[in-house]
Amino acid sequence: TALVRGVASAMYDIGASFGGFDATLESELSAGSGLSSSAAFAVLMCRIFNGLYNNSELEPYAVARVAQQAENLHFGKPCGLMDQLACSLGKAVYIDFLTGEIIPVNADFSRMGLTLCLTDTGGSHAGLDTSYARIPADMRYIASFFGKELLGEVDPAEFYAKKWNTSDRPVRRAKHFFDENARVP
């Protein structure tokens, strides 16, 4: 119910309408499993309000922002916008948060002869909010070594040329950031 209230509150904040409805939801996703279940649920609630009360006028980016605000302020999850935006767009995308560019990614696994399988490992992301919330600060910390505010402004070659203590969490996170971006064309 916190996410539903949060979505309604965020919609109120942007001047969008909302109201009551009856719904039943079933899911086989475990809460805290790392599959963006809270982002997907918040996006779903926003889309329902958007369709019922706003003639579907909110664009996917606005829907994602509403969902993010609901998670941040009402669900206690200090998340970014990536999961909500991917859920709102409904497809695999490359998102450059520095430029705002969003590029669809061809994820037709069957055409490539692959099958995407999800496995329940029994792990949980529940309780990781404090560590997760430190990610933006860690990224800015590394960026500050190069006189930049955001890690996306740093040249990866400059980052890799510097001698780092690779056991430091901010360094590992920055390396992951650059490695992930290098994987996407």
Q: What are the residue ranges of the model-derived segments?
A:
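Gly/Ser-rich oxyanion-binding loop with an adjacent helix/lid
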Residues: T1-F109
